[in-house]
């Protein structure tokens, strides 16, 4: 283990970049920039590092808090006879987006601030983190989501069950294809924003980019929720959908559950391919 290297930017990969920032970077030649090495597929060495487990715990806690706050907000809207008396769809969208903004800001320096298996999957496909770390993150995210939804149910069981438990489903008037398409496009928007906000080359050139990264990510979540809540209740996060479905545990929560895994993973894969092949053109760059 390489000792005390705990820089977890770019998906919590220990392979770091040392690049100039601010005006120094702006004056540097393009050729001075070097692509960071790709993360290995398997990195058994990580299993002996405390920073690896610390990052997983951070993902668990962040996803726990995300489900706790967001589902409570959904319940507050659903229990009211008049949506005018509540925060409404806009408030739900702000709750989800605002929590992602806050939690990414808090955990980015520890785990990379994924809080979403689709984000982790996209970063893995782009070789920003190892399979070992990706699987561990996804497991901790799902466990955190289940616990977050479970605590809400424990506090207000009657209201929780009566308001649908925040579980995702394709709403009446829409087909399964509509729901799948909404999840694919919505997750593409999110993961594409994550790649852009954490792009190493932009971070090297502009010193303000790493500081502001949580803002566009949270705002992307907000906008996607505004657009797709009427269609699927907005998943774009398999852990969020799984946690609510397991704790609510009613038949309709499982009917379309596959959509909330397949859609986000396809969207994340498309975003990763677009970033690597088109935006960064990494396969076409000279190996010299």
From Swiss-Prot:
Motif (NPA 1): 116-118
InterPro entries assigned to the protein according to its UniProt record, in alphabetical order: Aquaporin-like, Aquaporin_transptr, MIP, MIP_CS
Motif (NPA 2): 237-239
GO cellular component, one term: plasma membrane
Localisation: Cell membrane
Biological source species: Oryza sativa subsp. japonica (Rice)
Membrane topology reported for the UniProt record: Multi-pass membrane protein
UniProt name for this protein: Aquaporin PIP 1-3
Annotated segments matching region Disordered: 1-30
UniProt main location, coarse: membrane
Cited function: Water channel required to facilitate the transport of water across cell membrane. Increases the capacity for root water uptake under water deficit. May play a role in drought avoidance in upland rice.
GO biological process: response to water deprivation
Listed transmembrane segments: 57-77, 92-114, 135-155, 177-197, 211-231, 259-279
Keyword Transport tagged: yes
Pfam families assigned to the protein according to its UniProt record, in alphabetical order: MIP
Domain-level remarks: Aquaporins contain two tandem repeats each containing three membrane-spanning domains and a pore-forming loop with the signature motif Asn-Pro-Ala (NPA).
Keyword annotations: Cell membrane, Membrane, Repeat, Stress response, Transmembrane, Transmembrane helix, Transport
GO MF annotation, one: water channel activity
Gene behind this protein: PIP1-3
Tissue expression per record: Expressed in roots and leaves.
Induction pattern: By water deficit in upland rice. Expression decreased by water deficit in lowland rice. Circadian-regulation. Expression is higher during the light phase than during the dark phase.
Family (UniProt): Belongs to the MIP/aquaporin (TC 1.A.8) family. PIP (TC 1.A.8.11) subfamily.
């Amino acid at each position: 283990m390489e000792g005390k290297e705990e820089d977890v930017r770019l998906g919590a990969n220990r392979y770091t970049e040392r690049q100039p920032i601010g005006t120094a970077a702006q004056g540097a030649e393009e050729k001075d920039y070097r692509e960071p090495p790709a993360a290995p597929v398997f990195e058994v060495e990580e299993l002996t590092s405390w920073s690896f487990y610390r990052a997983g715990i951070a993902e668990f806690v962040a996803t726990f808090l995300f489900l706790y706050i967001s589902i409570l907000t959904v319940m507050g809207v659903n229990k009211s006879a008049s949506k005018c008396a509540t925060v409404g769809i806009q408030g739900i969208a702000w709750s989800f987006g605002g929590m992602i903004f806050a939690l990414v800001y808090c955990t980015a320096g520890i785990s990379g601030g994924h809080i979403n298996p689709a984000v982790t999957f996209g970063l893995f496909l782009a070789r920003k983190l190892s399979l070992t770390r990706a699987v561990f993150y996804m497991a901790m995210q799902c466990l955190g989501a289940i616990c977050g939804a479970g605590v809400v149910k424990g506090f207000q069981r009657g209201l929780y069950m009566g308001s649908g438990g925040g579980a995702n489903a394709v709403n009446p008037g829409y087909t399964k294809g509509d729901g799948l398409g909404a999840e694919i496009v919505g997750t593409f928007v999110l993961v594409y924003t994550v790649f852009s906000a954490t792009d190493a080359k932009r971070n090297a050139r502009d010193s303000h980019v790493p500081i502001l990264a949580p803002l566009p990510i949270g705002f992307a979540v907000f906008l996607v929720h505004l657009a797709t809540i009427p269609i699927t209740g907005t998943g774009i996060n398999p852990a969020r959908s799984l946690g609510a479905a397991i704790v609510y545990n009613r038949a309709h929560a499982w009917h379309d559950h596959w959509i909330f895994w397949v859609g986000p993973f396809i969207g994340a894969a498309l975003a990763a391919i677009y970033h690597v092949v088109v935006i960064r053109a990494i396969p076409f760059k000279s190996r010299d």
